């Protein structure tokens, strides 16, 4: 399959995982299952790309120029993209699971998921801020033991 087709397929399939995370209510485990299966598939694709093409790339991770040279190889650039897709989806899955565990509204989770999908760490930072506030306010509302 041409690399451009693999790129399009991976980029389209990951949307199903994000849609499941955003649309399926917390009480249904389907969203987690869909997202994890897609992340596993993307991780397998990543491993296959790295296994097949790693030796063909020039460059490395020692400098920005080295990384640029490494990503000049189309298959390794695709591998980097698939890496982003898989890891961001796993972070989004964790955000959803954690939001459900702490009782964070799905409506508050949605901007976090959108930002994690588009800008990775920015969405995670927003989620962590919301998580902190939610946990802090929950503690204030809990009765003190022995009173």
Language model region names:
Residues 1, 66-80:
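Short aromatic-rich membrane-water interface segments that cap or initiate transmembrane helices
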């Amino acid at each position: 399959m041409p690399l451009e087709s693999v790129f399009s397929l991976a980029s389209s399939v990951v949307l199903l995982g994000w849609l499941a995370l955003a649309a399926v209510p917390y009480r249904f485990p389907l969203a987690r299952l869909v997202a994890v299966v897609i992340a596993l598939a993307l991780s397998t694709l990543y491993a296959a790309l790295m296994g097949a093409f790693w030796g063909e790339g020039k460059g490395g991770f020692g400098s920005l120029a080295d990384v640029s040279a490494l990503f000049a190889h189309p298959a390794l650039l695709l591998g980097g993209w698939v890496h982003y897709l898989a890891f961001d989806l796993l972070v989004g899955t964790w955000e959803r699971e954690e939001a459900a565990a702490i009782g964070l509204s799905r409506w508050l989770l949605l901007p976090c998921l959108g930002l994690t999908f588009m800008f990775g760490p920015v969405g995670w930072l927003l989620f962590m801020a919301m998580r902190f506030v939610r946990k802090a306010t929950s503690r204030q509302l809990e009765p003190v033991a022995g009173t």
